[in-house]
């Protein structure tokens, strides 16, 4: 599936969020906390910008989790069929993607890197290799690094140096090279800068 390959810093500035979780994006937002372009510093959102604000929240969620529109819409429709708040359901389904679990486990420094690890067959679920980034894990699933991945310098470096602790719905084992899905993530365990209710309002129009 095609992914966004354009200027990442520019996109992060447009959405006012470091959506690709890299140091370059963080520095750019600190240095220029306004949209790109000739009039970015002084440009105001139009008075009728409710739709634009809602659209921006959807775009942020799409780019953070690496989905294209069709896949994102399909996930939203599934979330809407579930019991409970649709917005929270949406974020929960996105969090349970295998590539996101690899990122949350601390094996990858960014979600795009996590997606690459999964696509290259470096991840196992319940003892079997799974190379589909969008595959969804469930409570009780055990996600591990393949023997090859467990010996990769880049992954060991990430485990040793990344400054984020494993989220509450995952449990680490095997020196950080295995995680078990303890439960489905609650909203308070999801730290993405997305106002999910605005996405619900957008799709409800």
Regions found by a protein language model. Give the residues of each.
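Beta-rich strand-turn-strand
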Residues: 108-111
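Short, well-ordered loop/turn sites that connect or cap secondary structure elements
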Residues: 117-118, 137
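Ferredoxin-like alpha/beta domains used as RNA- or RNAP-binding modules
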Residues: 1-105, 132-205
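Short, hydrophobic/aromatic-rich beta-strand segments within well-structured domains
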Residues: 113-115, 201
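Glycine- and Gly-Pro-enriched alpha-helical subdomains that act as flexible
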Residues: 121-125, 129-131
